[in-house]
Amino acid sequence: MKNICVWSVFGLLTVGSAVQAQTTNTTDKSPAPTTMPKTADKEARRGELLATFGGCHDCHTPKVMTPKGPQPDTSRLLSGYPSNASLPAVPQGVIGPTQWGALASNDLTAWAGPWGISFAANLTPDVTGLGHWTAQDFIHTMRTGKHLGMGRALLPPMPWFDSAVLTDQDLKALFKYLRSLKPISNQVPQPIPPQATAAH
């Protein structure tokens, strides 16, 4: 009798496992990732995942318009606001305490708000981007929210306060990924202060 119970339990577990595996295989229709990390170096690959998950491409990569909406322009990864782009005018009376909080350019690389107009930085290793930066410069900037850790404040929508909680190891991995990108010459303009926003 004891053997029958043991074999019955074993049989039920086996059948249950098979049903579970079959159910999982047939009902799990999660889409496969559309892009897999391409960076060969393990630390840089981790940085690439952090950049992707952290939304760096949302603002720092110019977009191309597709039937599904704006998509990252993979030929200009993380190169920031295109220096040859024409900046649309900011409508008067649209941004304010009882109005909209911010407006974005069509490719989401320029933002207007109470702070003025900010432009997504070039994060590639070109001299017009992070070419002269060290890992320590990058870490200090991400920790303080100030350009090179002592310059002007990083403006919205840059969520530096979220990046500030990353470990030094994570920030070094992110910087290593940025250094692995194709250098793109693109001198991003300086921010435009609120009082000059009306002229644009």
Language-model regions: role of each:
Residues 1-4:
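Positively charged n-region of N-terminal signal peptides that target proteins for export
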Residues 47, 53-63, 138, 174, ...:
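The canonical Cys-X-X-Cys-His
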Residues 19-23:
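Boundary at the C-terminal end of the N-terminal hydrophobic targeting segment
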